[in-house]
Amino acid sequence: KLAEILMMPGKTVSVEQGMEIPVTHDIGTIRLDGDQGNSGVGIPSSRLVGCMTHERAFGADTMELGHIDYSFKPVKPVVSNECQAMEVCQQNMVIPLFYGAMPNMGLYYTPDGPFENPGDLMKAFKIQEAWESMEHAAEHLTRDTVWVMQKLFASGADGVNFDTTGAAGDGDMYGTLHAIEALRKEFPDMYIEAGMAGECVLGMHGNLQYDGVTLAGLWPHQQAPLVAKAGANVFGPVCNTNTSKTSAWNLARAVTFIKAAVGASPIPCHVNMGMGVGGIPMLETPPIDAVTRASKAMVEIAGVDGIOIGVGDPMGMPISHIMASGMTGMRAAGDLVARMEFSKNMRIGEAKEYVAKKLGVDKMDLVDEHVMRELREELDIGIITSVPGAAKGIAAKMNIEKLLGIKINSCNLFRKQIA
């Protein structure tokens, strides 16, 4: 099957009809307005414009708002600005909108943070001190992340995307899992996605445990149950790209890893597929032929419930993935299926069946633009083109609440404001 996909003659390939999945995002609007020498294309635009471009021009099923520095720690001094941006976006958008950032525990070490760099301490054979530094940093990571998301959730965010969990090793994952646990306890209805930084959790500390399981050395199929236990709705497994090997070799390895993770996970899996992970080549402008083949393989062979679109230019990442395997958001029913995955932890098959039943259509109709255009206009649940008088933003989402039998956070905020 994989060989067939790789050898298909077309430049772009796509999943078979009916197998489309919802997409989530890393890096927010930075791929549009960012210009840091990586994958941002430097278009001067507001984040509202960036988010709505993903929703209405790219056909995204979900989107996220993110700070230009894209870590939780730098958000603290400007959290009021982030909250205002979130409110404005939620008033104008229909698809689920997350707040995304990296836990990035490395920012808590000197010279950027208050704690001694454990790498320097270990070089000096101060092992106990290095352990303590990591433990303190993890505590601060948990505290800061929870505080930031308390503010953002109060401003209408649908949820949070933890991007590159474990980037600084097992301490980073430890702090993030405890943040997820605290947020789930405080906000039962928050959408929580936890995407990993790498395929194996690095044992920088080595002794840290969560739920009695040592975090160091965990692989995707072992990470998934812990992320679910902490309270996440969706897990983002990773398989690293080996830049010394071919795309075919990397994709075969990635599909093998992710298929095992999907099988072991009690919650939906949105495989991370930015440049350098998930069988995607390491290039700022990811090759479209490689991206679409990887996207198709992950859906049809690994059986993922969704794809987390990561770093890469707009053409090579969101557009290519959505063309290959996405549900095209408000053009069809992608946003509705995504909401069921996040609000009820439904796997892709169950989510599609639920939404199709509520709409009174076949599952195949969920990606039929003609069928869904008429239905969305009739039900007033938001349409992708701007029709005067049609429900938009909060109004459309209130109708989606009634249709799907769920509560949407931005609608709850609006109801409180007019009470």
Curated annotation (Swiss-Prot):
A Pfam entry, by short name: Dimeth_Pyl
Organism domain of life: Archaea
GO function terms (MF aspect): dimethylamine methyltransferase activity
Involved pathway(s): One-carbon metabolism; methanogenesis from dimethylamine
First-tier enzyme category under EC: transferase
Keywords: Methanogenesis, Methyltransferase, Pyrrolysine, Transferase
InterPro entries: Dimeth_MeTrfase_MtbB
Catalytic activity: Co(I)-[dimethylamine-specific corrinoid protein] + dimethylamine + H(+) = methyl-Co(III)-[dimethylamine-specific corrinoid protein] + methylamine
GO terms (BP aspect): methane biosynthetic process from dimethylamine; methylation
Record-listed E.C. numbers: 2.1.1.249
Primary role: Catalyzes the transfer of a methyl group from dimethylamine to the corrinoid cofactor of MtbC. No evidence for expression of this protein has been found after growth under presumably inducing conditions.
Record-linked NCBIfam families: dimeth_PyL
Family of this protein: Belongs to the dimethylamine methyltransferase family.
Record-given protein name: Dimethylamine methyltransferase MtbB2
Species annotation: Methanosarcina barkeri
Lineage: Archaea, Methanobacteriati, Methanobacteriota, Stenosarchaea group, Methanomicrobia
Gene: mtbB2
